[in-house]
């Protein structure tokens, strides 16, 4: 396990990660940009089988028991074929809707079973929601390479410098904010219960958040000691937050961080120094959409699997 106070991914352009000090260890690579929602392809295949079944079926007529499709009020064969086509389409739509409802119900039951299996009687990491947050979804944000990038190596024009004690020696940590992070925090301030959950140590992350959160919009701060040690990875177990998982979202650049709850995750690219980065702004429309859904996992998990 890492002994460094900072947990972050490797910057391919930063030779400091390979220095003898070994103060900034590497982690997993980030995922690609958040995928767009799409309809699963296997439903079309199921529909084609139903079409084949329905193509040979014509609704019966009370007068001729469906044996004659050419003598109903003088309608032409083309009219009858068109009616049959419309009927088949209606049946197909009803079948697709039924299949989708069944799939969602099965998926929700899987989530319920998963949630129940992870409840082990531990005291939640957070106290119950305060009254003004009741009804809001919980947004869990990573810190390093998601909101900021920190380095023990001096950087040009850092946003702030944090002194950190390591083995009796004070080291200066140079912190740069991701583009638009201030706008991002302001935009979500009243829409979510906001939690920063980092695998870094509190002695580094706490003062960083003091500088970053000038508007005091972050409601909880969770650090490395709140992570779960799983096969050498710091995993952020969302089931320990004391919040309903269907209303919990995590934004993180490291897939290992949300290993237990990938269906709750919005992956974000790791940020180091790209001044043109707009990832945080690009997240806002998606977050606004998730506010409106009952179970965020149904949206995020479907997008992740397509």
Swiss-Prot record:
Active site: 142 (4-aspartylphosphate intermediate), 144 (proton donor)
A biological process term (GO) from this entry: hyperosmotic response
Molecular function GO labels: metal ion binding; phosphoprotein phosphatase activity; protein serine/threonine phosphatase activity
Chain residue ranges for the region called Disordered: 1-45, 61-116
Sequence ranges of Polar residues compositional bias: 1-36
Reaction(s) this enzyme catalyzes, per UniProt: O-phospho-L-seryl-[protein] + H2O = L-seryl-[protein] + phosphate; O-phospho-L-threonyl-[protein] + H2O = L-threonyl-[protein] + phosphate
Cofactor: Mg(2+)
FCP1 homology domain mapped to chain residues: 132-290
Site note Transition state stabilizer, residues: 198, 236
InterPro entries: Dullard_phosphatase, FCP1_dom, HAD-like_sf, HAD_sf, TIM50
Listed GO CC annotations: nucleus
Residue sites binding Mg(2+) per the record: 142, 144, 253
Location(s), subcellular: Nucleus
EC number(s) stated in the UniProt entry for this protein: 3.1.3.16
Signal peptide: none
Biased composition (Low complexity): 61-111
NCBIfam families listed in its UniProt record: HIF-SF_euk (TIGR02251)
Record PANTHER family: DULLARD PROTEIN PHOSPHATASE
Function field: May function as a phosphatase involved in the regulation of cell growth and differentiation.
Name used for this protein in its record: Probable C-terminal domain small phosphatase
Gene from which the chain derives: fcpA
């Amino acid at each position: 396990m890492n002994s460094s106070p900072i947990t972050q991914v490797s910057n391919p352009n930063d030779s400091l990660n390979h220095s003898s000090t070994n103060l900034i260890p590497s982690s997993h690579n980030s995922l690609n940009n958040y995928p767009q929602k799409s309809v699963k392809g296997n439903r079309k295949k199921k529909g084609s089988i139903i079409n084949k079944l329905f193509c040979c079926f014509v609704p019966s007529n009370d007068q001729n028991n469906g044996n004659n499709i050419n003598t109903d009020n003088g309608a032409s064969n083309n009219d009858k074929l068109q009616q049959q086509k419309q009927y088949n389409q209606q049946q197909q739509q009803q079948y697709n809707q039924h299949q989708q409802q069944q799939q969602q119900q099965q998926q929700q039951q899987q989530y319920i079973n998963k949630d129940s299996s992870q409840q082990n009687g531990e005291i939640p990491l957070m106290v119950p929601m305060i009254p003004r947050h009741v009804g809001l979804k919980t947004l869990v944000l990573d810190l390093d390479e998601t909101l900021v990038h920190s380095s023990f190596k001096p950087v040009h024009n850092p946003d702030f410098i944090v002194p950190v004690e390591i083995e009796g020696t004070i080291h200066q940590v140079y912190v740069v904010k991701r583009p638009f992070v201030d706008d991002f925090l302001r935009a979500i301030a009243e829409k979510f219960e906001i939690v920063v959950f980092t695998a870094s140590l509190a002695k580094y992350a706490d003062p960083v958040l003091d500088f970053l959160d000038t508007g005091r919009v972050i409601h909880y701060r969770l650090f490395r000691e709140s992570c779960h040690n799983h096969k050498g990875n710091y995993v952020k177990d969302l089931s320990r937050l004391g919040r309903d998982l269907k209303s919990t979202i995590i934004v993180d650049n490291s897939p290992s961080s949300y290993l237990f709850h990938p269906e709750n995750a919005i992956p974000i690219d790791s940020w180091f120094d790209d001044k043109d980065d707009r990832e945080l702004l690009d997240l806002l429309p998606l977050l606004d959409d998730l506010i409106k859904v009952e179970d965020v996992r149904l949206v995020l998990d479907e997008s992740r699997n397509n």
